[in-house]
């Protein structure tokens, strides 16, 4: 996969992408990441990329021409078509489902806004999709771009050493459940013991426990993700057992069962 990032701070993206999974993907030739600075395509001595908004008001707006010239250079660098994605609070919410869609693309262009944003005419003519990574305000789109680069890269075939790592992550699978708890050595510690089932060597029992924990955690922490009506009989039974155990523990501790 190739990802081109248009940003006034392309070095930021390069630094974020130099480590961990994304860094290894580049080393293995599974990801080609290229940063582009629209300032290098601006005209005049000052290479201006922004100006005051029409109608007044605070802040500056990124200009059409430097962005257009930069995008032309991006598109000329690779013949493969690529959607242009802009980061905006008005965009489609980034989810694991959307990440899987993007991961199927051979190439994409990520556009990072700054200041008060980008001239609307450029967005209308050149942008194919707007994405939001959450309902909060950032100083620019670079953090959003770094997030997309990471979530999309780890879904590429051969990037993760263990293919099951991605399949078992939170939000993966047909129900999009949260992940189950994980433990490592030592098995016994002052802060608690590893559940006995995980030390049993019984793979069927371990798989059952993990599925139940995923269902229970999703019900407890992100009920908006859980479609109980869509669960099969096995999953409904596991979830009901989880609830009973939770209620029993709450009663023994004198707490009110939750949620």
Curated annotation (Swiss-Prot):
**Positions of transmembrane segments:** none
Q: Which GO BP terms apply?
A: tRNA N1-guanine methylation
Q: Which GO terms describe its cellular component?
A: cytosol
Keywords, alphabetical: Cytoplasm, Methyltransferase, S-adenosyl-L-methionine, Transferase, tRNA processing
User: Which residues are listed for S-adenosyl-L-methionine binding in this entry?
Assistant: 113, 133-138
Q: What class of enzyme is it?
A: transferase
MF term (GO), any: tRNA (guanine(37)-N1)-methyltransferase activity
Q: Which NCBIfam families match?
A: PRK00026.1, trmD
Subunit architecture: Homodimer.
Summarizing the function annotation, the protein's role is: Specifically methylates guanosine-37 in various tRNAs.
Protein name as annotated: tRNA (guanine-N(1)-)-methyltransferase
């Amino acid at each position: 996969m190739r990802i081109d990032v248009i940003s006034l701070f392309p070095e930021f993206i390069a630094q974020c992408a130099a480590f961990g999974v994304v860094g290894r993907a580049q080393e293995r030739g599974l990801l080609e990441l290229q940063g582009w600075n629209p300032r290098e395509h601006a005209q005049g001595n000052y290479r201006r990329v922004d100006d005051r908004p029409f109608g007044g008001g605070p802040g500056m707006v990124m200009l059409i021409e430097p962005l257009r010239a930069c995008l032309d250079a991006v598109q000329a660098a690779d013949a493969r078509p690529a959607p242009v994605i802009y980061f905006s609070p008005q965009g489609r919410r980034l989810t694991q489902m959307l990440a899987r869609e993007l991961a199927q693309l051979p190439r994409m262009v990520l556009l990072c806004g700054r200041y008060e944003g980008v001239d609307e005419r450029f967005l209308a003519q050149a942008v194919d999709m707007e994405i939001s990574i959450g309902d909060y305000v950032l100083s620019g789109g670079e953090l959003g771009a770094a997030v997309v680069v990471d979530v999309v890269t780890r879904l590429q075939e051969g990037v993760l050493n263990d293919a099951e790592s991605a399949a078992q992550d939170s939000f993966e699978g047909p129900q999009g459940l949260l992940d189950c708890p994980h433990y490592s050595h030592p098995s016994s510690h002052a802060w608690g013991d590893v559940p006995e089932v995980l030390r049993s060597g019984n793979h069927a029992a371990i798989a059952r426990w993990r599925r139940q924990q995923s269902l229970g955690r999703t019900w407890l922490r992100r009920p908006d993700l859980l479609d109980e009506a869509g669960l099969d009989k096995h999953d409904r039974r596991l979830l009901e057992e989880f609830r009973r155990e939770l209620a029993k523990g709450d009663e023994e501790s004198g707490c009110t069962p939750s949620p």
